[in-house]
Amino acid sequence: MGKTKSRGRRAEKKNKKNEPGFNEDVSNLDSDVTITNQEPLSSSMSSTSGIPNTFFGLVDNNELDYFKQAESTLNINAFETDEERQGFINSVLEEAQGKELKLVTNQICSKLMERLILFANHNQLKKIFKQFQNHFVSLAFHKYASHVLETLLVRSAALIEKELTQTDEEKLEEAEEEEAEEEEAEEDSLNNDVPMEDLFISMLNEFKPHLTTMIDHSYASHVLRLLILILAGKELPSSVTSNSTLRSKKSKIARKMIEIKDNEDFDRAFQTPQSFKNELREYCQTIIVGLDTKSARELSIHKIGSPVLQLLIQVEGLVDRERSFWHLIFAKDSEGKDSVEESFVEYLLSESVGSHFLESIIKNDGARPKYIERLYKLYMKDRVLKLAKRSTTGVYIIQALLFKLKPVEVEYILDQIIPELAELISIAENQNLDLANKLIDASISRGNYRRDEIINQLFIKFAPNYDIENPSDNTSTEFIENILQLTGSTLGNTRDDWPTAEERKRALFLEKLMEYDYKFVICTWFNFMALPIERFVQMCFHGVFCHVVEKALIVEPEEPKPIQILRKRLLNIFQGQIVGLACNSYGSHIVDSLWNFTVLLPMYKDRIASELLGDSNKVKESTYGRLVWKNWGMELFVRKKYDWKALIKQQEQEYYGETEDSTEKRAKKPIELKMERLAEEKRRQEEMAERAQSGYTKRKLEEATGTASEKKQKLRGRRR
């Protein structure tokens, strides 16, 4: 019988798996990685003249398996001591010696090289740096090697600072420790004597012929931005935080997925030698020679090149008093309106990349205030409201201007926007919440400028049916619904959905409103009471909305009686839910906040404590419950009730400001004044009774001794 023919891709794939030399790990890499494990250099490099397109070799299967296992070992960090980890790193570096260049251009091995650089000591760092010499340009333009190079640059900046600030004694001690730890070849020891500053400058010289090409390259532009930050002595941003100015959004997400964490060298600035300022000046001059006004303006709206130009404008003041990059893009401050410049500024105000560029150069301290004021007065002042209506572009420029212009101009912008604030905010499309945030901050900075109008506009937008002066019991949930968008959110989901960034943004906005004015807190209370209890409890267990509930549990000083009654009604919602909240990671913070929220309400404090005591076993078995038990002083409640009552009394005294250090006295309540009058009257009556008793006793004594009749005779004699 003839042999049947296998059909389909699965059978073909199975046969391919059975072939000798097939590596399944390599075949499962993403489409950017070829079967040879080597990522080819980007197409822009190969097509651009002057950029070396160097091939560093392939990583064979045996090497790949070893380095992949080493990367996994470093990732889980299952070492008992730092010495054990350092010994493992030393062995991996010995195995990788001479192979560094082909490792950094491999997708898997490049992650290993990053980890090795993060953990390497200073001598090992210099060795790796020297292996990259004469190839830095090729690595900067490579998809994977560029990330390794960025990590190496940050560690190098830290080492340069250490060499600058290190005393001779510290250098001698470090040299002795290194000699005791390991015996190196004489050649290596001589090479390690070269200062890191000199090695860094030699690398900078490699990049100088290629700076203009690096500006708009997908990978090399990030390396260039990092070099500029180091030379300028600016803070080197983290590579994983969401607001990092260095990495792209995709890159930051990828680094979180592969679990590469920065060390202490990130998120800080380093001291730099004087030679770095000269190098920064040369870099700026080299870049600006290849630019004219047209190309610079095109670069400012380029998706990749724009962040580089923003950074150059920010740091150029350190080495160039003329601000050449600024005046290459915009006219001088003494010149008037120009039609070409006006068209360019209009494009910046209406395009996403351009508006981000303009917002960045306004926010950063690189541009002089008079430059920004000129652009504002010539091209933006007469249409502030129109720009604020551009919810994806122009409004961000207006927000940036609120904190950079003179006070008179800031108040002018506020006068234009505040009356139209309700119309500018869109609930459905979630637009201009940031504008409301910035208006509140700007108003506070100007001494609460037009505060009441801002509050009214926000209530008109988010709670049009709410009566601010006389809130009623039939208040709906429109306020928190319009802001938090509870319907359609992850609230109440049983699939362990993570709260979205949109929900976090809305929750922070509501918290900001409650901090701004207590009227928003009262409105939030009414909305909480209008919610079904199950829905409110779901908010307490939600990772984002629980913070809204916690922030709403605040008590105003000298609280009037109607507000105190409202506070009691809100506390009734928590009845029967305390134990469940106390045993939850989010709800436990709310129960902790209830301690301060129940000030002047000892009965409610006692009720909550009794509820915790009623199910004490469940509370004490929970990690979060034990913290609540401690914060509420439940041991005193159980064993020393009098001391627990003393804590409540102490809290009330602190609320009234009746402490030993306090100098101001609060206004006393009518009942307290009445009690003081009664006490004073009682004291006066007791004094009168005491005087009467003493007089009676004295007369009796005088009658008994006979002195009273003598006095009468004398008195009669005087009267005659």
Curated annotation (Swiss-Prot):
Biased amino acid composition, Basic residues: 1-16
GO CC annotation: 90S preribosome; nucleolus; preribosome, small subunit precursor; small-subunit processome
Residues covered by region (Disordered): 1-31, 165-190, 658-720
Molecular-function annotations in GO: RNA binding
Annotated compartments: Nucleus, Nucleolus
Record's compositionally biased regions (Acidic residues): 170-190
PROSITE patterns given in the database record: PUM
Keyword annotations from UniProtKB, A to Z: Nucleus, Repeat, Ribosome biogenesis, rRNA processing
Biased segments, Basic and acidic residues type: 662-690
Extent of the Pumilio repeats: 95-130, 131-166, 206-242, 290-331, 339-377, 379-415, 530-567, 572-610
InterPro entries noted in UniProt: ARM-like (IPR011989), ARM-type_fold (IPR016024), NOP9 (IPR040000), Pumilio_RNA-bd_rpt (IPR001313)
Record-linked SMART domains: Pumilio
Keyword Ribonucleoprotein recorded: no
Any one biological process term the GO annotation gives: endonucleolytic cleavage in 5'-ETS of tricistronic rRNA transcript (SSU-rRNA, 5.8S rRNA, LSU-rRNA)
Main location: nucleus
PANTHER family xref list: NUCLEOLAR PROTEIN 9
Its biological purpose: RNA-binding nucleolar protein required for pre-rRNA processing. Involved in production of 18S rRNA and assembly of small ribosomal subunit.
Protein family: Belongs to the NOP9 family.
Protein known as: Nucleolar protein 9
Naturally occurring in which organism (per UniProt): Candida albicans (strain SC5314 / ATCC MYA-2876) (Yeast)
UniProt lineage: Eukaryota, Fungi, Dikarya, Ascomycota, Saccharomycotina
Gene symbol of the encoding locus: NOP9
